[in-house]
Amino acid sequence: MEYFKNVPQIKYEGPKSNNPYAFKFYNPDEIIDGKPLKEHLRFSVAYWHTFTANGTDPFGAPTMQRPWDHFTDPMDIAKARVEAAFELFEKLDVPFFCFHDRDIAPEGETLRETNKNLDTIVAMIKDYLKTSKTKVLWGTANLFSNPRFVHGAATSCNADVFAYAAAQVKKALEITKELGGQNYVFWGGREGYETLLNTDMELELDNLARFLHMAVEYAQEIGFEGQFLIEPKPKEPTKHQYDFDAASVHAFLKKYDLDKYFKLNIEANHATLAGHDFQHELRYARINNMLGSIDANMGDMLLGWDTDQYPTDIRMTTLAMYEVIKMGGFNKGGLNFDAKVRRASFEPEDLFLGHIAGMDAFAKGFKVAYKLVKDGVFDRFIEERYKSYREGIGAEIVSGKANFKTLEEYALNNPKIENKSGKQELLESILNQYLFSE
């Protein structure tokens, strides 16, 4: 059965094309710096937003029209979604997809029944993977939707819930390995608190670390060689989440001796919810060798929640890819479109239009970022700006030779301090030149 009959194979036609079902900037086979653009970007489709989101919001009923809506049995729906998914993957020619365990198969009455459902759908996906060019970027477990996780999963006050969450992650790790997943993600949507009046924060954080160590041990036991990732987010659905931002997660991993096993999966909209630029989170992760993968989306700056829009801001995609290029490119990670069509964009074809928009935006951003890095535009300015640390007293500070006494002596004998302009306006103008040069 063909689920998206009105959508052709999506191909590159160039920036002058008026075809909505064509790439304008993303030419997957274009060679840049010795390898195809598709290998630089490593695009991925998010199974949840693309195939399970129905358009429900706190004020209204579902709006999405999907070709599998006529099915009523949850397993029939799950099977139809797999068929539709691989049709979409093929027509978009994306190299990867990501999933939660509960995205691909429905939850049963018991954990055994749920695992049986998973086994059925995983077997079906494995058959598709034998002939598909699309592979699994990462898998994860949904430890936030079911009411059992009302108080958290690994940080729940109820040890029975901790045990259930462990069993669920055990199974999710197994199927991610079985499907050839290159990474495994932890996102703690319910790992946090609503009020400290009823919260043992110390125990919760200790338990979260215990949980992650158990995951590492089991992954090693079964031979899973994928990269473990944690995805920071400051809030929503929980008031305060422990994985608040890149720095918070890094500190947590360092404290509990987990940093050698984990990297970060940075999401644009989560960064803005934490009060940071997307580039800030990427930069922090990169300079600490913690940048593993990216959830590509954007938020609405006028709204205070996670809108998960398709990324269409070229400035944002350029600065994001600047950080990726500066780190030497992705290893096992990629650009996963953790994005959903708007509630009013309810037609099946909109799923393709959203991905085309995001893929074009990141392709354009990559090309601009590559030129910025190659030309050393910002590097030269930064090198000049900090040159005082390469000579004289600055070199002594950096080398560790200086101390408060020597610095005081220097300051007493150097009464005149001269600062130079940061030239922010000039640099932003230069960035615009590169953005609009094509």
Swiss-Prot record:
SUPFAM superfamilies per record: Xylose isomerase-like
Reaction catalysis annotation: alpha-D-xylose = alpha-D-xylulofuranose
GO MF, one example: magnesium ion binding
Active site: H100, D103
GO cellular component: cytoplasm
Ligand binding (Mg(2+) 1): E231, E267, D295, D338
InterPro entries assigned: Xyl_isomerase-like_sf, Xyl_isomerase-like_TIM-brl, Xylose_isom_bac, Xylose_isomerase
BP GO terms, sorted: D-xylose metabolic process
EC number(s) on file: 5.3.1.5
Record keywords: Carbohydrate metabolism, Cytoplasm, Isomerase, Magnesium, Metal-binding, Xylose metabolism
Annotated compartments: Cytoplasm
Cofactor: Mg(2+)
Cofactor, how bound (note): Binds 2 magnesium ions per subunit.
A Pfam family: AP_endonuc_2
UniProt: Mg(2+) 2 binding residues: E267, H270, D306, D308
Subunit structure and binding partners: Homotetramer.
Record-stated family: Belongs to the xylose isomerase family.
Protein name in UniProt: Xylose isomerase
